[in-house]
Design a protein with these regions (language model features):
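N-terminal interaction modules that seed assembly of large macromolecular complexes
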Residues: 27-91
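Long, charge-patterned amphipathic interaction tracts in eukaryotic proteins
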Residues: 68-136
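N-terminal amphipathic/basic-hydrophobic helices that include classical n-h-c signal peptides
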Residues: 1-27
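Short, surface-exposed, charged/polar-biased interaction segments
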Residues: 55, 59, 69, 91, ...
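Compositionally biased, low-complexity repeat tracts
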Residues: 9-12, 18-20, 116, 124-125, ...
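Glycine-rich, aromatic-bearing surface loops/beta-hairpins
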Residues: 127, 131-174
Length: 174
C-alpha cells in the first residue's frame, strides 16, 4: 500500500500544471517542513486520515478507497505553499499563545478567539472552495479523532485541512 501511495503521489505531482505546486512543490514542502512540524506535535498523516474518516459520508466509494484517496489529497495539499504557510501560522500561534501561556485567557479556546477559526476556514477554502467551509463546520464542532486532543489553533487548522480534502473527494464522487 505504501508503494501504491508513493507512486500515486508522484503521478499527481508530475501531472500538476501549476508551476508553484508542480515540480517546485518539494521545495515548498521542505521550506516549511510542515509535515515534520506536525509530527513533532503528534499529528501524523495517518491520524489526520483517521479523523477525516470519523465523519466520512460515503458517496459510493468504499471506506478503504476513500481513506487512501484522502491520504493522497492531504499529502498533495501539504505541498501547496498557501496551505503550508497557514498551517505553519497555526503551529507558531499554538506554541506562542497556547503552549507558552498556559494560564492565559485563551487556554480554553474562548468564544472571542476567532483567528483560529479563520485560519481553519482559510485552509479549507484554499483546498476545497466554498463547500469546504461547511465541511469545516462539521469537523470543528464534532472534533473526531486527533482533533479533540489539539489546542485551539491546531484543531481548527487540521480540521480545515481535512474539510478541504474531504470536500474535494465528495465533489469528485458526484
Amino acid at each position: 500500500m505504501i508503494i501504491f501511495l508513493s507512486i500515486a503521489f508522484e503521478h499527481i505531482g508530475a501531472s500538476c500544471h501549476n508551476p508553484i505546486i508542480g515540480e517546485g512543490s518539494h521545495y515548498f514542502s521542505k521550506m516549511f517542513e510542515i509535515e515534520e512540524r506536525l509530527e513533532k506535535k503528534g499529528i501524523t498523516i495517518d491520524a489526520i486520515v483517521e479523523a477525516a474518516m470519523g465523519l466520512y459520508v460515503s458517496h459510493g466509494m468504499p471506506d478503504e478507497q476513500a481513506s487512501m484517496n484522502l491520504k493522497i489529497k492531504i499529502l498533495k495539499s501539504l505541498k501547496d505553499p498557501n496551505v503550508s504557510s497557514l498551517l505553519l501560522g497555526a503551529v507558531l500561534l499554538e506554541e506562542e499563545l497556547y503552549e507558552k501561556r498556559k494560564n492565559s485567557e485563551i487556554a480554553e479556546d474562548p468564544v472571542f478567539l476567532l483567528s483560529d477559526e479563520i485560519i481553519g476556514m482559510a485552509i479549507a477554502e484554499c483546498i476545497g472552495g466554498t463547500y469546504a467551509r461547511f465541511e469545516f463546520t462539521r469537523y470543528d464542532q464534532k472534533k473526531p479523532g486527533i482533533l479533540a486532543t489539539l489546542g485551539p489553533f491546531l484543531d481548527d487548522a487540521v480540521a480545515g485541512l481535512i474539510a478541504g480534502c474531504t470536500s474535494r473527494l465528495y465533489s469528485e464522487c458526484v
